[in-house]
């Protein structure tokens, strides 16, 4: 397997939702940052789409004891908007994926700004960062299936879900696989040519 253990990876995914609330002061965000068994095109090389799937059950033994909600993975602002450790960030694992609910601090302007940005749909995508424990790769479908996630670090509101850091690790993984596939094709071509010359 070509992935590097303990290397943090980032993925952009589904939109945030502002739930209807009878409490007009509540600043709640909901979303599904991880959707199981759904192929996602991570990149394309030479017209071939390289996909990734997070398998149902991949989070079964995942360390989710302390992950956070932030913005853009804390790159421009280190604000922690919610955290599992203090129960301001809650999650459930369903058949569909990982669902989160974050209770933001209405007294903090940064929290109000994030809530407003999501409410106005200026920010409507999520991303997550994690470390892979186990994965498999299908050379025929060019699909990497993550079967076990070791640790979840954060779920993040992202301004641009396709910004470079979102899939740096995935692109390097798929670039390695693409190079291997090309080398295997070249080796098969040479072998066929040698066999033709021998007979």
Residue ranges and their predicted role:
Residues 180-199:
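Enriched but not universal
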Residues 1-180, 199:
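Signature of dsDNA virion morphogenesis modules
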């Amino acid at each position: 397997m070509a992935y590097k253990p303990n290397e943090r990876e980032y993925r952009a995914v589904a939109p945030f939702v502002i739930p209807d609330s009878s409490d007009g002061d509540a600043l709640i965000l909901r979303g599904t940052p991880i959707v199981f068994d759904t192929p996602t095109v991570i990149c394309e090389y030479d017209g071939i789409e390289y996909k990734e799937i997070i398998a149902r059950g991949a989070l079964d033994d995942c360390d989710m004891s302390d992950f956070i909600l932030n913005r853009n993975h804390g790159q421009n602002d280190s604000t922690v908007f919610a955290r599992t450790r203090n129960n301001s960030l809650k999650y459930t694992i369903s058949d569909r994926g990982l669902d989160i609910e974050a209770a933001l601090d209405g007294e903090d302007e940064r929290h109000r700004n994030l809530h407003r940005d999501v409410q106005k749909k200026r920010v409507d995508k999520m991303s997550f960062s994690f470390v892979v424990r186990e994965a498999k790769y299908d050379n025929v479908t060019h699909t990497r299936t993550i079967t076990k996630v070791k640790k979840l670090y954060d779920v993040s509101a992202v301004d641009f879900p396709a910004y470079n850091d979102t899939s740096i690790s995935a692109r390097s993984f798929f670039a390695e696989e693409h190079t291997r596939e090309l080398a295997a094709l070249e080796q098969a071509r040479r072998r066929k040519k040698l066999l033709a010359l021998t007979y």
